[in-house]
Amino acid sequence: MAAIKPIKTYKGKIVPLFNDNIDTDQIIPKVHLKRISKSGFGPFAFDEWRYLPDGSDNPDFNPNKPQYKGASILITGDNFGCGSSREHAAWALKDYGFHIIIAGSFSDIFYMNCTKNAMLPIVLEKNAREHLAKYVEIEVDLPNQTVSSPDKSFHFEIDETWKNKLVNGLDDIAITLQYESLIEKYEKSL
């Protein structure tokens, strides 16, 4: 009954963006919030950092550098996703191609929006993030709650509810449907 792609183990290319306090307006500027679907926001992710005034790629922005092209794991600083509670920020990062975001901390609402959009937010200490950023690819094992480079593994914490949803590929609707018979029974009792 999976409604989203389950995350069990994931190996991907990383891109470091070690700024602290990256807010949702920096992730997806409000000028781009005119869409009514979840898709199509990727080209606008980090818009003000990603592009030069003439619209060309900013060569100094890490995700634009050739060695980071195709990265699906973002390693970033503390307090990622702070600011307004727009879910568009998670949509933009997912549409950009990120599956996992590793930060020192997250805004609570942004963290929840990631999990609701099949992205895994992971909290790790700065030394662990700096170590992982030295590698081209790293591996995440959600059932065992580890992030590994070729030479070292780091444990991370995640609420069992979020972990269950992501490991089993369950969105809110799929979870509700698990209780369909109880819901029907209750409705008949009214």
Swiss-Prot record:
It comes from the Bacteria. Keywords: Amino-acid biosynthesis, Branched-chain amino acid biosynthesis, Leucine biosynthesis, Lyase. CDD domains: IPMI_Swivel (cd01577). Pathway: Amino-acid biosynthesis; L-leucine biosynthesis; L-leucine from 3-methyl-2-oxobutanoate: step 2/4. One of its GO terms (molecular function) is 3-isopropylmalate dehydratase activity. Its EC number is 4.2.1.33. GO terms for cellular component: 3-isopropylmalate dehydratase complex. Gene3D superfamilies: Aconitase, domain 4 (3.20.19.10). Belongs to the LeuD family. LeuD type 1 subfamily. Heterodimer of LeuC and LeuD. This is 3-isopropylmalate dehydratase small subunit. The lineage of its organism: Bacteria, Bacillati, Bacillota, Bacilli, Bacillales.
